[in-house]
Amino acid sequence: MCIRDSCNTHSSFKDPVRMSNLCQEITLPTEPIDHIDDEMGEIALCILSAINVGRLNKLDDLEELCDLSVRGLEELIDYQKYPVAAAESATKTRRSLGIGFIGLAHYLARQGVAYDDPNAWQLVHNLTEAFQYYLLKASNQIAKEKGACGNFSRTKYADGILPIDTYKKDVDDIVPNNLNYDWDTLRDDIKEFGLRHSTLSAQMPSESSSVVSNATNGIEPPRDYLSIKKSKKGPLKQIVPSYGSLKNNYTLLWEMKGNKGYINVVAVMQKFFDQAISGNWSYNPADYPDNDVPVSVMAQDLLTTYKYGWKTSYYQNTNDMKSDEIEEPTNISKPTDVECLLAELETAEEDCEACAI
């Protein structure tokens, strides 16, 4: 679902945003094409990356990570091949990036807070402020080196308007608007030198990248400590990071009573993100009479997300009470073996040099 009001009022573009992509994190201007070689149209592409915030030791570590992410995607824009002219011209003139998180559940578990905890909302606010600040700072630095993107004048950034100016002020009811970084100086630098990119941030589902990084999915609470992910290569078992030391700190999806905590987490993130967040609503029928989720509950969640400035939403998840068990020849397929494995991990030493890299 794409909420066009928020997609445009809280956008970095002066041009209208009319739609999002399948995963609901991309909110870029588009224009129709008359034929395959039509360069006057605009096809928006997903130029994405994600930072594993679960591994962060301090917020200022984001400065280098954001700079590397922005510079890597900056080179990718010029390096990759484009089969359609409207995609190439739009991407190279706007140079829109979408960098997000993986491992947020791990990050909150390390801090000892649950998604429903107001302290978690404050931590996410501080994290996302630092994240967007350093992304913009990196793009501004590249603009000093290479020049601003071709369509920079068609962004609100060119007028010194930042995401902290256009977000839904109802978010201040969740976390007070106390900012920790020097946004005024950054605003002046952006007005003077521009940005190399029209957008910097977007929160994708990140199913694949989280597996490769052994991180929790994007900003999602895990469904269980041990999950099984299916792919063309076959099933893959994945255990939440630092299970041994953080088992009791993780927020599991179906243990959450309602969507309030998650909605608030996404809201404070959207305050700073210049594209959208692939957010979900999750319902456990077991929490309601007769295992029936009331329409009024879902309607209330919809209205709440609108109030707090969500731009898009992706899935409505429902707990079907089915396990992730699969039939395959493996030495941990039985529940008893899984429990033994988790118990072994719970007592294992996790601070080895290899894990610290």
Question: Each PLM stretch: what is its role?
Answer:
Residues 326-357:
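Acidic, low-complexity intrinsically disordered tails
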Residues 100-103, 135-139, 298-301:
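Extended, hydrophobic alpha-helical segments in both membrane/secreted and soluble proteins
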Residues 48, 104, 207, 305, ...:
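Hydrophobic, well-ordered secondary-structure elements that form the walls
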Residues 24-27, 32, 73, 77-78, ...:
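Catalytic alpha/beta core of large soluble enzyme barrels
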Residues 66-88, 114-206, 278:
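Internal maturation/activation junctions in enzymes
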Residues 4-91, 96, 101-111, 215-218, ...:
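Function-dense linear segments that define catalytic or interfacial modules
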Residues 1-2, 207:
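Active-site loops and adjacent core secondary-structure elements that bind or stabilize anionic groups
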Residues 35-39, 56-64, 87-99, 111-130, ...:
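Alpha-helix capping and helix-loop boundary segments enriched in small/acidic/polar residues
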